[in-house]
Each structure stands twice: as structure tokens, then as C-alpha cells.
Amino acid sequence: MRRPLAVFAYDFDGTLAPGNMQEHAFIPDELGMAHADFWAEVKVLAEAQRGDSILAYMHLMLEKAREKGLELSLDSWRKRGANLPLFPGVEGWFSRQNARAEALGLDLRHFIISSGNRELIEGSPIAPWFERIYASAFMFNRHQDAVGAALAINYTGKTQYLFRINKWTLDEWDNEAINAVQADRDRPAPFERIAFFGDGLTDIPVMRVMTDHGGHPVAIYDSAKPYTEAAAAQLLKDGRARLAAGGDYRQGSQLDDLAVEILAAMARGVRAELFE
């Protein structure tokens, strides 16, 4: 008998890793500019074009890379992501949670839902743990060089991927299965068995959906940056997150203890369903 699906979904920047990934893997070292200046240009471009800030940052990354003569191949982007800094304990987190879930009779899967660069995340050491990496992605030509944006995931776009997971229609390009009628009881990953870990404003719509549908939204903060803890506290106060913890993924941390509680609650829900 197949074990019931359970899902841990994560934002990346500020959730699994400190700061913005582009600031560690691209902007200061290769572009030779301050990250604040880069993001200021993104804002100006998005406003001037009345466009999306995710598309704006992706456009500027490619434009400035071409001006510098930087390599744009898929492999080069993944190499840039290989040394992304992660919060303490992240690399050991996934196997530990999987073992706990299995002991409870659950089949735990991990997903990324991020506005950051998919190619950078694919190059990180934790990439193999994810069922899918839903993140903004470049379009590549036949030479495998980035030529434009293939996928941009902004703060509201993130909610789409919750429903893809919920209905287990995982292909980004599939517009039919995701819109097909499917009763809640028939969905492979009900929201009650989904936890979402996120850190900021771009995660608010996702957290709202999670809260409204009985999921487990968790606000993550960087203990080294007090303003992020204040932001997490505000998410709790506003009813957007149900739980909050610092970005310490080591065994025995507050966040690890919350994961134990969440998995136990998911397992109790499965048992309750058996008697309905």
C-alpha cells in the first residue's frame, strides 16, 4: 500500500539560504557592481516598463552579462550556484525529515517555490532532494546559452505551484490538468499535508492560501538580522503564518522541533480520515 503523500515546500532566498542568491553567485563578483545598485536598476526598469520586477531582474542579468562578455551557458549558471551559502544544518535536514515521515507512514516530498533563479538552485548541493524546483528560469537556445526568460515566478505566481502540488499536476507547461475539476478528497497532496516555509513579502499570498486551506505556513527568519525576526513576528500577528522559527535546520533546533510537530499533525490527520 502506498504511503500518503506529505509535502514540505520552501522559498529559497532568506529561507534555506541567507540573502538573495544573485548577490552571492553573480552580481558583485562577476558584474562588478554593488547589489544595491543592481536592484535599484531593476526597480527603475520595472517601473519604466510598467512590468514585472522578476522579468526586469532576469533581463538585466542577461543584458549586463552580455556587456561583460560573461558565459551564459546552462552549465555556467549551475556552476555559479554550486557555492551558494546555506543556513546551518540545511544539507542534513532532508534525510532526517524523510526518515521521520517514513516512521509515521508518510511519503514526504520536498519542493522549491522561489522567485530566484532555477539554474542557480539546480547547481546547489541540495538540488537532488527536491521533487521539483519551481523557480524563475531562463530560456536557452540550441547552443544551451541563455537568451531570455522562460518562466518568471512572482509573489502571486507562487500560489499556482501550491495547487500544482495539491493536484499533483507538476509540469509547469501543463495548462489543462491544473484546471481540470478534481474534488478535494481526490487530490493526492491535500493542503493539510503541505507545509510551506518562507520568509517575506513575496511569500504572503502563498501563506494566505495555506492558512485558508488548513496547511502549515511557517515563517523563517535570519537570527543574525533582527529585522527579519520582526517581519516573521508580523506574519504571525497578521494571521499569515501559523508558526515561526530561525533559519537553523540542525537537529534539535526550534525549527527542527516544529517539523516534528508538523509531521505528527499530518499523520494524525491521515488516521482521522480512515474513520470518516
Spans of model-derived segments:
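Alpha-helical substrate-recognition element adjacent to the catalytic core
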Residues: M1-R142, A241
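C-terminal cap/substrate-recognition subdomain and adjoining C-terminal extension
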Residues: G81, P85-F111, S115-E276
